[in-house]
Amino acid sequence: MSKEKEVLLNDEIQADEIRCIGDDGKVYGIISSDEALDIANRLGLDLVMIAPEAKPPVCKIMDYGKFRYQQEKKQKEAKKKQKVIDIKEIKLSVKIAQNDINYKVKHASEFLEQGKHVKFRVFLKGREMGSPEAGVALLEKIWQMVEDIADRDKEPLLEGRYVNMLVTPKKKK
């Protein structure tokens, strides 16, 4: 069973009186549901309840198959417009050499140019847990290297055994 609410069609409509609208926008006014069903059958279309909460309920005479197709088409378009955020993670340690930092920053800048978010994670081992400031200092050093091409989304923050910082590509003006 689908998640969307079911739409009442033709004989499923139990209301005595309904407000009826034609496929072309013509307003039939408040008529009995039987009369609206007769009009829909004469036109070879369906009677679809579009506003069951209204008093009286609002029904429209239309081609239900075409209506469903249009709804699915709108949903597909909306889904296409959604942007999936891709986060790349770069792991570091407190005792990383400068050359390795340069290499990791180069990769991070490539990811940022592709429009991806980059999460830097500094792993704290053993006694390093006692001074997470070293991890924060390393992330601040990295931030100075990427600040011209990125915005800092999340400040360096200790989470468990990691010090994390999230950077995002700069917004184009």
From Swiss-Prot:
One of its GO terms (molecular function) is ribosome binding. It holds the Pfam family IF3_N. It is found in: Cytoplasm. It comes from the Bacteria. GO terms for cellular component: cytosol; membrane. Signal peptide: none annotated. One of its GO terms (biological process) is ribosome disassembly. Keywords: Cytoplasm, Initiation factor, Protein biosynthesis. NCBIfam families: infC. Monomer. IF-3 binds to the 30S ribosomal subunit and shifts the equilibrium between 70S ribosomes and their 50S and 30S subunits in favor of the free subunits, thus enhancing the availability of 30S subunits on which protein synthesis initiation begins. Belongs to the IF-3 family. This is Translation initiation factor IF-3. It comes from Campylobacter lari (strain RM2100 / D67 / ATCC BAA-1060).
